[in-house]
Each structure stands twice: as structure tokens, then as C-alpha cells.
Amino acid sequence: MSIASIDRVAAQGRWRNRPLAEKCLIGLGFLALAVTVPPFPGAVLVTVAILAFTFLGARVPLRFWAAVAVLPLGFLTTGAAVLLIQIGPDGIGLAPQGPAKAAALVMRASAATCCLLFLATTTPAADLLSGLRRWRVPAELIEIALLTYRFVFILAEEAAAMTTAQRARLGHATRRRWLRSTAQVIAALLPRALDRARRLETGLAARNWQGEMRVLSTRPAASPLVLGLILTLQAAILAAGVLL
């Protein structure tokens, strides 16, 4: 799943025009809860709430979300499996408290991952950067982030074009050819990336770039009622996670 696909779904989604403050409060607020409240029931309640916002509120397609989540959740599962075993003088065995630690890790990290995926699939990067500008983040940092973000798309397009060309020439027919073709892509990607960066710099200079790239944003103001409801829900989950 490419970064461009995620940004496209966020730009075309149901919550595309929701105020940025509301989406950030949901994503970052629940993320803070996920890493602070006890894994059970706090992190579980965070996961349920953020998935409800994702699928029932924002209507993010389930199949697309699963395709995006499979890699981080798969990595999480592998990391949790390591906690189940230990290597000692007697060899490999089940670690004491291993299942409990693995379960706590899975619950807490899954909740945090779902929060970040909510923000990624509902908020385009341009909106996040324009929000940072309104929050008085230094313009230099915003411009570096914006140029880096756009350059990632350029690199992805270059790599995809090179891989497609290799497949058309049967460069992936066997495992040996695949390894050789992949090495060639990696070796050729850096010179192409530097060339594209040079052309990008020349284009910006030709347009009299003064160190700031403005992005048009017409987002409505956040509703105090909606913000209050979100905070109330988060406070309820915090209380449940601490008291239960």
C-alpha cells in the first residue's frame, strides 16, 4: 500500500472537510490514552472507540484499512512473540510472565497503531501542515516537512516505474533475477533521486521561491460542542481504565 493511496483516500473520504482540530483531538487524544492507561481495559476501550470513529464515523473502507494495517500489526505480532520465549542455560523455554507481557504489548500497541491509522486515513498531509502553520510552528520546519513529503512521492514513482520496466523484461522471472533486479533498482534510485531533487530546486528558484510554500485551506472552525463530546468520551475511558 503506497503513501499516495493513503493520502488519496484521506482526501476523498467522508471526513475530508471535518475541522482539523476535531480529528487531531480524536487521533492524538486517544493515542495519549493508549500509551498511558492500563492495557486492560483502557487500551481495549481506546481501540473500540477509535475503530468506531474510523469505520462508523469516517467510513474508511474496511478492505483498504486492513491493507494498510497488515504491515504494522504483523510487525507487532512478531515482536510480541519474542516476549513469549527466553534463552537461558537450559535452552529455549517459555518466559515467566511472557504471555501477560505479550498481551499487554499487543493491546497497547494495537490501540496506538489504530489511532495513527485513523489520522492518516482521514487527514491529508497538506491539511496537517497547514494546521501546523496556524499553530505557529516555525515556517522552516514546515517547508522541510512539505518538501520531504512530496519528494517521497517522487521516489516512490521512480521506484515503481523501474520495477514495472524490469517485470516487463522478465527481470522477476526467477528468484535470482529478482534479487539482481532489486539490487539494480536500489543502485539506480539514488542518482535519479538526486537528479529529481536538483530539478525541483531549479524549478522552485525559477518561480522565485522565498522559503515558504502556501497551501490553500478552507477548513471550517471546530465546534465547541463536538470537542466537548470527544473530551467527555476520552475522560470516561480514562476513568474506566484507571478504576476498573
Swiss-Prot record:
Pathway: Cofactor biosynthesis; adenosylcobalamin biosynthesis. The chain crosses the membrane at residues 26-46, 65-85, 112-132, 141-161, 224-244. It is found in: Cell inner membrane. InterPro entries: ABC/ECF_trnsptr_transmembrane (IPR003339), Cobalt_transport_CbiQ (IPR052770), ECF_CbiQ (IPR012809). GO terms for cellular component: ATP-binding cassette (ABC) transporter complex. One of its GO terms (biological process) is cobalt ion transport. Forms an energy-coupling factor (ECF) transporter complex composed of an ATP-binding protein (A component, CbiO), a transmembrane protein (T component, CbiQ) and 2 possible substrate-capture proteins (S components, CbiM and CbiN) of unknown stoichimetry. Subcomplexes composed of CbiMQO can be isolated from membranes but the CbiN subunit is not isolated in association with them, suggesting it is only loosely associated. Expression of just CbiMN in E.coli confers some cobalt uptake. Part of the energy-coupling factor (ECF) transporter complex CbiMNOQ involved in cobalt import. The complex confers cobalt uptake upon expression in E.coli; can also transport nickel with a very low affinity. Belongs to the CbiQ family. This is Cobalt transport protein CbiQ. The gene is cbiQ.
